[in-house]
Amino acid sequence: MILQIISYLCRMLLSVIIPVYRVEHTLQRCVESVLSQGVDDMEVILVDDGSPDNCPVLCDGWAEKDARVKVIHKDNGGLSDARNAGIEMATGDYLTFVDSDDYVKDDTYPALLQIMAEHPDYDLLEYPIVNRLSLEDRTYQQTQEYWLDTKAYLHTYAWNKIYRRHLFDDIRFPVGKIFEDVYTFPQLLRAATTIATTQIGGYHYCPNPQSITAQADGAALSMLLDAHLQNGMPMDDIYYLHLANIQSDVWERTGQPIRLAARQVDIAHFHGKDKLKAIILNTLGIKKLCQTNKLIHLLKKPSRW
């Protein structure tokens, strides 16, 4: 009983989990954007994933200066393993993630926490990605509606969302998988009762050309395709064509057997290149679409002569 009381008294409102690995040039911008949000009832968990640069020292420096900062030093295990370590330490009623290449727009967290406080039924709140993803103020009771209406399969990112802690009671990120968010996010959606989006706040995503996903090869894209095919989420024609594009790239780069089942789509849903792809799908099938995609890429390659 005493331990339960202590645990309750030590709980924070918000836990911000930031995996850290080889980001000494962007880490200060990231961490300062979080610490300057004006949320006192917050813990910032910096997970040093065995970073070989100056990041471990930087993390310890923040912990010495700001009591809200907690640091985990661990052997390198990858992004999923680092996030999972942060989840295990987190005591917040709400969880959120920030990648250490990125940063958070001023005054974002206070506004999001106010929304969550006013709507105790919200289990998950998604907010905009600056210059990349605009959202409306909407509430979804059905996972299918949210998944398809917002094209959530295109923004399964862990980071531009606030989660109630209980969603992670039995869910963790898959260690050893690339595109780990695509595996995890559908599980979180199924665990949620109410999902909401807001136009308030902003997450600054800063692409890193050296990241694993930016340098994804055929094996990585095959993993991405598997994540989508195994997620059990509803599929409309637009989502199907998105998967057909991934399947085409996987087939071209690996020669692996086609795993996406054949399907007819409504041509009226598409325009331009997508409409042409839809026509090929309906008339010739998914394998011919893959072959056509490969041929086009070969023709676009510059000649060595």
What label would you give each PLM region?
Residues 2-223:
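Nucleotide-sugar donor-binding/catalytic module of glycosyltransferases
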Residues 178-183, 239-253, 289-304:
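A broadly tuned preference for mixed-charge, low-complexity surface segments
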